[in-house]
């Protein structure tokens, strides 16, 4: 990591909950300029949060961590959707929501283990959705 700023991953949380809205609001904070921010998730989930808040953000979108170049900016969105575009229903637990949360969390943990990011910040998760996706509470971080 050549850049002196810390690399912080922000996870969108449960796509059916308040997480995407909270992340949308967080991305508007000037304090984030003190770090390199990598939002990890599915693009359509952040867009749903932006619709609720009325915010838009100047993020650089990438599909692989290796595509990130902090000389081009300090806020990136790492889209891990792999082309899927699920329409998550708000306030409704589902295995799909839980799977999305677990995919983002596992991706961020792998980046942390390989020293590519320094910290993970995550919006609220729904343990019921995570359990529907095949995880019990004991195995959740």
What is each residue range found by the language model?
Residues 1-137:
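Contiguous, glycine/small-aliphatic-enriched amphipathic segments in soluble metabolic enzymes
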Residues 140-141:
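Conserved small/polar residues in nucleotide/adenosyl-binding loops
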């Amino acid at each position: 990591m050549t850049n002196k700023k810390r690399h912080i991953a922000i996870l969108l949380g449960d796509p059916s909950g308040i997480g995407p809205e909270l992340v949308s609001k967080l991305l508007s904070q000037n304090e984030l300029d003190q770090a390199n921010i990598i939002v990890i998730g599915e693009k359509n989930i952040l867009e749903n949060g932006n619709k609720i808040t009325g915010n838009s953000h100047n993020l650089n979108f990438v599909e692989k961590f290796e595509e990130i170049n902090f000389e081009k900016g300090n806020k990136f969105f790492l889209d891990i959707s792999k082309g899927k575009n699920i329409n998550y229903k708000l306030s409704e637990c589902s295995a799909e929501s839980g799977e999305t949360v677990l995919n983002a969390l596992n991706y961020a943990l792998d980046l942390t283990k390989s020293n590519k990011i320094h910290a993970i910040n995550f919006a609220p998760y729904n343990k019921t959705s995570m359990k529907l996706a095949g995880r019990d509470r004991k195995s959740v971080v």
